[in-house]
Amino acid sequence: MNKIITGMLLILSLPTAAQDFQGRIYDAYLRGRMDLWKETMEQMERKAAIEKDPVLLYELTEVQYGYIGYCLSMKQKKEAERVLEEAEAQAKVLLEKGIEVPRVYSLIGAFYGYRINLQPIRAPHFGKKSEEANSEALKRGPREPQAWMEKGNIEFYKPAIFGGSKTDAVPHYEKAVRLFEESPGRTDRNWVYLNCLAGLGIAYEETDQPEKAGKVYKKLLDLEPDFKWVRDELYPDYLRKQSRD
């Protein structure tokens, strides 16, 4: 009997799998440990394949979104394309099930953006598709912060010759941050929120608003003093630029 009670208490004391996965992803993001991110992502893939849980499938797709972006930044295009194909297929399933529809359309818009990186010759086609998916996200969720963040990304990274504008990206990032902070639970150990704040800081720097950029970086370090990307790269680089100026 004691063994049964002990086992039941152990089960009750454990976090849910989704909570555990998200906590590990968040910690990997803070520490800049993409090896741990990938390891957790692969565990999520195996669990999602067995359980067919649509909530877990959405969380996995979001984690893959972050991993693909990292792979592209590291010029690991084959790995990026492999995971992107999986994520795109999962996004279709999520739409069919009606799970987190505005967020899913936001991710689809980002996936088309990744396609531009992989197939630059088709940039006009994928760029249009990205904007269409983002418009659908905003139509279905006008207060969805991730939709506004991705709208900011589209404007920020689209070449000026095709109508992109870093200046126009700033208010979209600002609105995304505001909506994250107005939405209950959306800032609690959420790597996407931190990423959005970092994107806003970078956009401020790129549009000659250094004072605002500095405030964003300080805010990030107040929230998470051990956020490696900001602590070791973004903020020190910002301070060096300011000392030269």
Regions found by a protein language model. Name each.
Residues A17-M74:
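N-terminal leader/linker segments that initiate helical-solenoid repeat arrays
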Residues W37-T40, A80, A87, S130, ...:
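Single-residue signature of alpha-solenoid repeat helices
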Residues E45-E59, Q90-V104, S135-E144, V177-N190:
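Flexible helix-coil transition and linker loops at the boundaries of alpha-helical arrays
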